[in-house]
Regions:
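Hydrophobic anchor at the beta1->P-loop junction of P-loop NTPases
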Residues: 8, 31, 182, 196
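P-loop (Walker A) phosphate-binding loop of NTP-binding proteins
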Residues: 11, 22, 34
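Conserved glycine(s) of the Walker
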Residues: 15, 153, 192
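A conserved segment at the C-terminal end of the G1
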Residues: 17-28, 195-197
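Switch I (G2) and immediately adjacent beta-strands of P-loop GTPase domains
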Residues: 33-65, 79-86
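Conserved C-terminal guanine-recognition region of P-loop GTPase G domains, centered on the G4
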Residues: 78-141
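Canonical P-loop GTPase G-domain recognition
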Residues: 124-172
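Conserved small/polar residues in nucleotide/adenosyl-binding loops
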Residues: 184-189
Length: 197
């Protein structure tokens, strides 16, 4: 059985790669304050409760720019969106809601995929800052405050994203019924595709 895919998308420098690293529990993605560091899709395993899924980090989406590298990054993000079962849309509390955020939100709504709106860089604990409520204007429902640096709020977004993923306990029961012959076939098949990721 293939794992469900969850894509992390957003404009440049909102903390997507930091969040990716925090959620997979290791530093796989390079993190810098310079836009364009992440250019291709990067995959990592993520586990939460009874769910095991592939998390995909993407480069920053710049909807209105068509130069070579930025266009490539946008195409890679679109591929991640197309293959994902659910999407984490990361925004930045400090920058507030931007025109780029609104453009990306519209693109995600057109995809028809379930989206969890993540408002990153909420680094203090306690009552959510009033600026958080501005993110309702994106039309994607409840904004989830997160600090990808400190890990605050990551459990909440994982809980929410798992609501959109198939219940893997049922799949485990189905896997138990696979015969030895078909298990060997599946095992060989997955060994051949693991290197492609």
């Amino acid at each position: 059985m293939s794992k469900p895919i969850v894509a992390i998308v957003g404009r440049p420098n909102v903390g997507k790669s930091t969040l990716f690293n925090k959620l997979i529990g290791q530093r796989l993605a390079i993190v810098e304050d310079t836009p364009g560091v992440t250019r291709d899709r990067l995959y990592g395993n993520c586990e939460w409760q009874n769910h095991n899924f592939l998390l995909v980090d993407t480069g920053g989406i710049e909807p209105s720019v068509d130069d070579g590298i930025l266009l490539h990054m946008r195409q890679q993000a679109q591929l991640a969106i197309d293959t994902a079962q659910a999407i984490l849309f990361v925004t930045d509390l400090r920058a507030g809601v931007t025109a780029q955020d609104a453009d990306i939100a519209n693109m995600l709504m057109r995809s028809g995929k379930p989206v969890v709106l993540v408002v990153n860089k909420v680094d203090s604990l306690g009552a959510p800052p009033l600026e958080l409520y501005d993110f309702y204007s994106l039309g994607l429902g409840e904004p989830y405050p997160v600090s990808s640096v400190h890990g605050h709020g990551t459990g909440d977004i994982l809980e929410k994203i798992c609501e959109y993923l198939p219940d893997q306990r049922e799949e485990v029961e189905e896997d138990d019924r696979i015969t030895d012959v078909s298990y060997t076939h599946l095992q060989g098949k997955s060994c051949g595709t693991a290197g492609l990721l």
